[in-house]
């Protein structure tokens, strides 16, 4: 038949947060992962082989089109498993490095001063070729990475001071 089944929800969703301390230093890490789900990558569908017309599409994707399974992928956008990819990923969401100084020896108005820096959206480890494997997994269009839904996820840098009175 012409039915297509997408595993749009991960089999496993997990996260790990930990803080390591050594003397006055602390290092925190926040990671999470989704494993075992499919993403329909619409980028190549709209911008790749189907986005071209005529002979140009055959030159770009010739090896893939030699397979009879994909002989009819051209022209009008067609949803098919050709654009289905494993969306499993591991994201390092944040890493924080801090240093705490005991102030009670020097002043009566504060006990401790902590200076820290955080990097957000550190890395995404995935085999997915699209923009971001973390797509909507609920509703009618779960598991679809849409071309028009492509706001970049920025890396952030934060510096902070924490005072304990």
Each model region followed by its residue ranges:
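Outer-membrane beta-barrel domain signature
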Residues: 7, 84-86, 146-150
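Short, small-residue-biased leader/transition segments that mark boundaries at the very start
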Residues: 1-6
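Membrane-embedded beta-strand positions of outer-membrane beta-barrel proteins
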Residues: 29, 115-117, 161
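Residues that define the transmembrane beta-barrel architecture of outer-membrane proteins
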Residues: 10-14, 88-93, 111, 153-157
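Long hydrophobic segments that form regular secondary structure
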Residues: 17-25
């Amino acid at each position: 038949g012409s039915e297509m089944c997408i595993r749009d929800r991960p089999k496993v969703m997990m996260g790990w947060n930990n803080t390591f301390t050594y003397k006055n230093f602390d290092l925190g890490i926040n990671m999470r992962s989704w494993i075992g789900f499919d993403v329909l990558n619409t980028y190549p569908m709209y911008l790749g082989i189907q986005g071209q017309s005529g002979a140009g599409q055959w030159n770009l994707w010739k090896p893939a089109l030699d397979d009879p399974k994909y002989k009819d992928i051209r022209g009008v956008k067609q949803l098919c498993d050709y654009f289905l990819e494993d969306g499993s990923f591991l994201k390092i969401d944040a890493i924080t490095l801090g240093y705490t100084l005991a102030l009670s020896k020097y002043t009566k108005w504060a006990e401790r001063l902590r200076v820290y820096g955080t990097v957000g959206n550190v890395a995404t480890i995935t085999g997915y070729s699209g923009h971001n494997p973390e797509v909507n997994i609920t509703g009618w269009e779960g598991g679809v990475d849409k071309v028009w839904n492509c706001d970049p996820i920025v890396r952030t840098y934060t510096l902070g001071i924490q005072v304990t009175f």
